[in-house]
Regions:
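Hydrophobic alpha-helical packing elements
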Residues: 12, 86, 129, 170, ...
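Residues in well-ordered alpha-helical elements
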Residues: 65, 77, 84, 95, ...
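C-terminal substrate-binding subdomain of Rossmann-fold SDR/epimerase-dehydratase oxidoreductases
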Residues: 178-284
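NAD(P)-dependent short-chain dehydrogenase/reductase
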Residues: 125-127, 131, 135-194, 199-208, ...
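N-terminal Rossmann-like NAD(P)+-binding domain of SDR-like oxidoreductases, especially those catalyzing
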Residues: 1-156, 256, 271
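Short secondary-structure boundary/capping segments
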Residues: 39, 77, 175-176, 212
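Structural element of the ATP-grasp superfamily
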Residues: 97, 137, 174, 265-266
Length: 284
């Protein structure tokens, strides 16, 4: 099989391409390197560099057996600084990918949604535009009869995660702070809870969605079903590194909790996520 991965130079995309190659597939990546790195290129995959809005220009009428659409402007806080770019990548880019698939009769798209869907979309440009991206996918599914599956991610961490303070998740940011002998910064009171899901499990979920012919009327929820407070995570870091903690003011769009409750991916796809958080911190 031949698959296209948008966002293939990013954290999740790179891990996904590794899995697809190990499964014996051909892989093409399209990435604009806004958060991904050219250093993440893997042998035996083909790489193109541009935004997904220009997918038709970059890839022409190439045929694929499926598209994993991961390419997006990620993270809540940067979306307040550049809402227009977030709209272009997350809405216009998603429409372009769906239209490319329709015109080239590509059988399936798996779209990377977000658990922010479960909070008020108006809380941030990121949440709103990921929500609209899902609606674009549903439009193409319902109007054109396409197989467009939505996979909602819950707080992904693991090997290759960004340590950039702007684009990284809390684990990546804290890793950077620890390496510089700085206190780890806790936003707000630290009692906000997150369903931390290892990238290995996210990739396995994505592949199960793509490889199976099982369709979901809404979205596949990819989370462990267990959440930790940020304070609990901070205690793991303190126990591992002996670092200090520093509380900073809360931020816009910082929702109180994420937790996967829907069991469809587990029950219908046989997906088996594991709680790997403490093991991951211990092995840093």
């Amino acid at each position: 099989m031949k698959y296209l991965v948008t966002g293939g130079n990013g954290f999740i995309g790179t891990n996904l391409i590794k899995r697809l190659l190990s499964d014996g597939h051909e892989v093409v990546s399209l990435d604009n390197l806004s958060t991904g790195s050219i250093n993440n290129e893997l042998p035996n995959a083909d790489y193109y560099y541009n935004t997904v809005e220009y997918i038709h220009i970059c890839l022409g009428n190439q045929k694929f057996d499926g598209i994993f659409h991961l390419g997006a402007a990620s993270r809540v806080q940067p979306s307040f600084e550049n809402p227009n770019q977030t709209f272009r990548y997350n809405v216009s880019g998603t429409e372009a990918v769906c239209e490319f698939a329709r015109e080239n009769k590509i059988p399936k798209i798996v779209y990377a949604g977000s658990s922010s869907k479960w909070h008020n979309p108006s809380d941030s440009p990121y949440a709103m535009y990921k929500y609209i991206g899902e609606e674009v996918c549903k439009l193409y599914k319902q109007t054109f009869g396409m197989d467009v599956e939505i996979a909602r991610f819950y707080n992904v961490y693991g090997d290759g995660e960004s340590v950039d303070s702007k684009w990284g998740n809390v684990i990546g940011i804290w890793r950077s702070q620890v390496s510089e002998n700085k206190p780890i910064t806790i936003v707000g009171d630290g009692e906000q809870r997150r369903d931390f899901t290892h990238v290995i499990d996210i990739v396995d979920g994505l592949c199960k969605i793509m490889y199976n012919n099982i369709k979901h009327e809404d979205a596949w929820e990819l989370g462990t079903g267990i959440n930790y407070s940020v304070n609990e995570l901070a205690d793991m870091f303190v126990n591992k590194f002996g670092c200090e903690k520093k509380y900073i003011p809360d931020q816009k769009g910082n929702y109180r909790a994420t937790l996967r409750e829907n069991l469809d991916a587990v029950e219908r796809l046989g997906w088996e996520p594991k709680d790997r958080l403490k093991e991951h911190i211990d092995n840093l």
